[in-house]
């Protein structure tokens, strides 16, 4: 089955998480007016007394065509990815309780200046780069037992 890739924006992505970006966001000045702070762009959640981790993930490009056959979710914490070198990347998400609801399966492509923060329990494809090796600043929960993986019928991404 084909899955159309849509441009990433907060309105269409809001059921799945937060788009981390400065475009059309409020800010205030700090540090004697030298810095614009775009404050509270995503809600970070960590359950069960674990701690929040900040890491860098170096992702390799996916083989083309991009084929989706499994999704994962993290029930005990949110997970954020922000590209550090301005590269666009693709995110694939779905809602659902015990298993992904394929009627909500969506794919989005960022503009290279956007990151994403997946809500807890949102099904998503494991991280990959799109066209070139990409470093991602990653914010997520430390600890174990926080990744459910489900196989799904194969979908091929369709870039229009």
UniProtKB/Swiss-Prot annotation:
EC number assigned by the record: 4.3.2.3
Annotated pathway: Nitrogen metabolism; (S)-allantoin degradation
SUPFAM superfamilies in the record: RmlC-like cupins (SSF51182)
Enzyme class: lyase
Presence of keyword Chaperone: no
CDD domains from the UniProt entry: cupin_UAH
Coiled-coil residues: none
Reaction(s) catalysed (UniProt annotation): (S)-ureidoglycolate = urea + glyoxylate
Keyword field: Lyase, Purine metabolism
GO molecular function, one term: ureidoglycolate lyase activity
Alphabetical GO biological process terms: allantoin catabolic process; purine nucleobase catabolic process
UniProt keyword DNA-binding present: no
Cofactor entry: Ni(2+)
Subunit structure comment from the entry: Homodimer.
NCBIfam families: PRK03606.1-1, PRK13395.1
Role noted for this protein: Catalyzes the catabolism of the allantoin degradation intermediate (S)-ureidoglycolate, generating urea and glyoxylate. Involved in the utilization of allantoin as nitrogen source.
Similarity field: Belongs to the ureidoglycolate lyase family.
Name the UniProt record assigns to this protein: Ureidoglycolate lyase
Gene expressing this chain: allA
């Amino acid at each position: 089955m084909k899955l159309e890739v849509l441009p990433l924006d907060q309105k269409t992505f809001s059921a799945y998480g937060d788009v981390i970006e400065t475009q059309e966001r409020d800010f205030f000045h700090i540090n004697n007016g030298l810095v614009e702070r775009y404050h509270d762009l995503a809600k970070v959640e960590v359950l069960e007394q674990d701690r929040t981790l900040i890491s860098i993930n170096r992702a390799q490009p996916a083989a083309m065509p991009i084929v989706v056959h499994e999704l994962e979710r993290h029930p005990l914490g949110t997970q954020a990815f922000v590209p550090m070198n301005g590269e666009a990347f693709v995110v694939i998400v779905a809602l659902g309780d015990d298993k992904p609801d394929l009627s909500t399966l969506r794919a989005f492509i960022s503009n290279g200046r956007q990151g994403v923060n997946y809500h807890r329990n949102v099904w998503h494809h494991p991280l990959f780069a799109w066209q070139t090796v990409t470093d991602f600043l990653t914010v997520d929960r430390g600890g174990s037992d926080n990744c459910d993986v489900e196989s799904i019928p194969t979908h091929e991404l369709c870039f229009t």
